[in-house]
């Protein structure tokens, strides 16, 4: 563990990394702003043996957002048609102006693209309204970065999604897990569970990532 994560201050540049959220329609001279469906997916592997591992950092952020739903926390439920677990949150439960779908896939990380694309098709979600939360080796534990498009940084889950979307840009929310110690292979490191101390930093990072997503959506 390199350092203790702290709450980061909102960056003025963060909201600009995402596409505008509202659809604009004109009706007899009136400008009408219509809400959309925002899809937020936390990447990870299925099964209790992977629940606390570093590769599942994205799922922790989805759980943080589930806890923020009003008037009571939301829960994921199996959505067989898309091989995912989802929570549908009507306008006002999490987002003021938009319907939100929080999700995690029931497929393994390397084949995340199929379920994510299926969710987008089912809920008619555009790539600019997709937020994928993932673990990031190249960020220190506790750091959070939101970006639109860009490379996959060797992350197989992102590669799968990018391929399924035909290379169209979408929002990526990186949660830092740090580099493996010594000569440990990254593939082994990401499947190791967080230590008790790291879990404290992860909880703070999950809250920071949730804040960043909500700021970007606006």
Annotate each language-model stretch with its function.
Residues 20, 24, 29-32, 36:
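An N-terminal low-complexity intrinsically disordered segment enriched in acidic/polar residues
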Residues 154, 158:
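Short glycine/serine/threonine-rich phosphate/pyrophosphate-binding segments
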Residues 8-25:
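Short, often N-terminal, low-complexity regions
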Residues 145-151, 190-194:
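Short glycine-enriched, charge-decorated loop/helix-capping segments at active-site entrances
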Residues 31-149, 159-174, 180-185, 200-218:
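Nucleotide and nucleotide-moiety/phosphate-recognizing core
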